[in-house]
A protein has these predicted regions:
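Domain-length accessory/inserted modules outside core catalytic folds
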Residues: 1-107, 111-124
């Protein structure tokens, strides 16, 4: 069973990389991908959220490791039959505005993930 993901640790890791995404939107995107295609690979997700990554750079390599842990943990959470899942958004100790903004970012990322995964819809 996947453990809850530390929002601040995840946020710091992503900020060290070449991206315009927030950790909340990036996590939402991952969840949207996963809901359509459970065999998603780490590189599929990283290719959508990162412009580039230099694994020879120690800070970027550490951040890559954190993102890989988030990926694996999220996959475990979403596959858990007890539905032990939490979106990566600001926690209860954060100001309400930040909590709301990160929830909005997560939802937007989720919808983008569904769209990029070509989720099938019908008019019926």
């Amino acid at each position: 069973m996947g453990q809850p993901i530390n929002y601040d640790l995840a946020k710091d890791a992503l900020q060290k990389l070449n991206t315009d995404d927030t950790i909340s939107s990036a996590h939402g995107l991952l969840c949207g991908f996963y809901c359509v295609k459970q065999d998603i690979q780490l590189d599929d997700w990283l290719n959508e959220i990162l412009v580039s990554i230099d694994l020879n750079n120690l800070l970027e390599k550490e951040s890559h490791h954190v993102l890989a842990e988030i990926f694996n943990n999220t996959s475990e959470q979403l596959a858990d039959p007890t539905l032990n899942f939490s979106p990566v958004i600001a926690d209860d100790a954060s100001p309400l505005r930040e909590q709301a903004n990160t929830l909005i970012e997560w939802c937007q990322g989720f919808l983008v993930g569904l769209g990029l995964s070509s989720v099938e819809t019908s008019d019926e």
